[in-house]
């Protein structure tokens, strides 16, 4: 069967830059699934994405589905014919459904009996006939949160569509996709190359688009070119470009023909905190800041044009003129804000609502101040500095700089606090109170910052849960999932001695009578333990290991982490699977027991050698392991408990638990309950698979 290259390109108006990659990758994944479901043999499915196009190129696509044999089993012979050998109604109905008579059916004989059988050969459908619907289906499944309509048609897509190219080898596949008749016409760059041209063969893509249309369709190639050219441009001026992955992705999604240029701004603006300047350059203008080798910001920036200009200096000057007023604004705000102390903004917090039922930002500040001090006392941080940081924590939200450049919240608080002469750990805490902001983000660097960050997040969790506004589905307007995980990460990774029970109770207490949810403490803790589940799954822990620890509901995050590591290590031991199975068996036996058990195992009632030996081991281990459990040395404890495998196996092989004599039966059940209690000091091992 011959093979050809298939090309589909959807030419559009400018696609959303932050969604471009996901659209292209989803298009490729959807179409690959369509090919595989149809049984069409194919080679690599390569995706292309540029601001005004999505495309796929499929190598070595078979021209048709393979012919295949189908078999359809009918009734057993005993049910297919009556005593006189005439076909039954069941047999005739089956044959009619297959398009044959009963006489035309074959016989299938196996060691289990004999059946009627229909066998047929189906010719594979041509690829050309299948492709239009496969493309349409793949596009319809794209993750587009908001669709557009254009013109008078009822067609919906992420952006208006102007061209659809469908080529199998050199042949156009006739189809109407998204309201556009397929053709071999492709549009080039808006301002360079040929605005429109035809492509003769799918193999010419994407090279023909680069040569004639001045468009680099390969997303990764554009991104790599921007990165390499920006690094070289920064090197030429003695610096290093800030090429964050997210901004690289966005810029690569904005240009079809990237041209990297270097511009500058007045050195006087360097007196403004670099974070504000960088916010303007990266956030507003999509520029790459440049830093010297010592980490200081240089008065330069790198940007990417979408055109090769005969006069690049004109483009450079234009971008410098655009950014200058924004930097001047930042300079003005910085100088104006410093004319008063950060603390002077406290009264204005009373005018800003945190949440209608929970009060203003000033109310939140008072709670954070108290909670940060309480946490500092628990973890051995400077209580005075923690309460001071709590008092100032939201003051920068009232400054001109943060009002205009919202992403500078926290960091500007740090700069203004330093200007006011606040303690350094207080200033740093104001910056780090929102950390970690995302997965993998840095944690607060000092104990005061940890206390403030936890206090801020716990106040939000307690308040929002306290009025019954739990996150539902994808809706989490107060970012409670991120807040919960942030608290857990700080406590675990900084090894802080904090208990979620007392921490949540204190956060709730500070709200007074504002909260209406009576179960708020349990709700918050359950929610946070649920975040633990997601965290440890991301870390590669098995679901049943997590379940085994969650079953004990440990509320000290550092303790939870120690149990997780202990159970994970326990699973590597040779004895683990047998002991997990034994724990499961014990759990089932105890669940069925209806008689009250003894407080202790009575040695005088023990009869069999195996139960006497198991009881002896339990007494020895109980005394030995108490310090292990008290110190959280769970891994060592489970290693010791692994020695129970042999006596437990002997017990179940040689001892009848449910003996007829009541005293013996209850004593043996008590023995098993003591065995289970030892393991439950760490986790519910019976849940391990």
From Swiss-Prot:
Assign the protein's first listed, main location to one coarse class: cytoplasm
Q: Which UniProt keywords apply?
A: Aminoacyl-tRNA synthetase, ATP-binding, Cytoplasm, Ligase, Nucleotide-binding, Protein biosynthesis
Q: Where would you find this protein in the cell?
A: Cytoplasm
Claim: Nucleotide-binding is one of the keywords in the record: yes
- Pfam families named among the record's database cross-references: DALR_1, tRNA_synt_2f
Domain of life of the organism in this record? Bacteria
Annotated GO MF terms: arginine-tRNA ligase activity; ATP binding; glycine-tRNA ligase activity
Keyword Ribosomal protein appears in the UniProt entry: no
Protein's recorded name: Glycine--tRNA ligase beta subunit
Source organism per entry reads Salmonella typhi
